[in-house]
Regions:
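Acyl-CoA/ACP chain-elongation machinery
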Residues: 84-129, 162-176, 202-212, 226-229
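Active-site-proximal alpha-helical scaffold in enzymes
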Residues: 42-45, 50-53, 58-93, 131-153
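Short acidic capping loops at alpha-helix termini that bridge into adjacent secondary structure
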Residues: 1-2, 86, 158, 193-198, ...
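Condensing-enzyme catalytic core mediating Claisen C-C bond formation in acyl metabolism
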Residues: 115-192, 198-199
Length: 229
């Protein structure tokens, strides 16, 4: 069976800045080295993993801000559903460094509770004041039902629907209608009713506006019952 990889990655800034600094200092682009360009690309994560794991299937990276990893799973689901791949390694990975975090802080999204980092992130709390930056990665391997049964795999979950939408109004301030459309689209694709959902994994950035609008969207879609968030 052909195995592909679709990963989410928002940015890769360190290599770009380090290369620019080296060129500025040495006045010679040849001294940057051939590896720098591959480290600068968002697709460096899927390129490297495909070589390490010797994957021969679909291979690309999705960059969709905080939704990058979720979109990777959604696209993997669609590819398998359409019969284009049997198995896809899906997930997301993001580096953390002072260079990218410094510019990110320009939108005042970070909590200022520096003396208590473990309790600074307070999603949907009235005293929330922003998120805590971090880096890392996570993987979900998707496989067609037929492929999983054939190899005797233990099936632990099923992806039944995928939804997406853009708010189309502001580059950084979320609205309510965008999340509502994406939730409703996922439910429609899965052919299930909102009342059947018993758990919702929220974006929950702990920002004042973000959490407020997300909560409004959740209540608008799941107005027939309270869903654990």
């Amino acid at each position: 069976n052909e195995v592909g990889i679709i990963y989410g990655n928002d940015s890769s800034s360190t290599a770009v800045i380090e290369a620019a600094d080296l060129i500025r200092d040495k006045k010679d682009t040849m001294l940057v080295g051939s590896a720098s360009i591959f480290q600068s690309m968002n697709s460096t994560v899927s390129m490297n993993l495909s070589v390490i794991l010797k994957l021969k299937g679909i291979n690309f990276t999705i960059s969709g801000a905080c939704a990058s990893g979720s979109h990777a799973i959604g696209m993997g689901y669609l590819m398998i559903k359409q019969g284009l791949q049997d198995t896809i390694v899906c997930g997301g990975a993001q580096e953390i460094n002072a260079l990218s975090m410094g510019s990110f802080d320009g939108i005042n999204a970070f909590s200022i509770r520096e003396d208590s980092p473990t309790t600074a992130s307070r999603p949907f709390d009235r005293d929330r004041d922003g998120l805590v930056p971090s880096g890392g990665g996570a993987t979900v391997i998707l496989e067609s039902y037929e492929s999983a049964k054939k190899r005797g795999a233990k099936i632990i979950a099923e992806v039944t629907g995928y939804g997406f939408a853009s708010n189309g109004e502001h580059i950084s301030i979320p609205n309510v209608e965008g999340p509502v459309r994406s939730l409703e689209r996922a439910l429609k694709d899965a052919k299930i009713n909102p009342i059947e959902i018993d758990y919702l994994n929220a974006h929950a950035t702990s920002t004042p506006v973000g959490d407020e609008n997300e909560a409004k969207a959740i209540f608008k879609v799941f107005d027939k019952g309270i869903v654990p968030v």
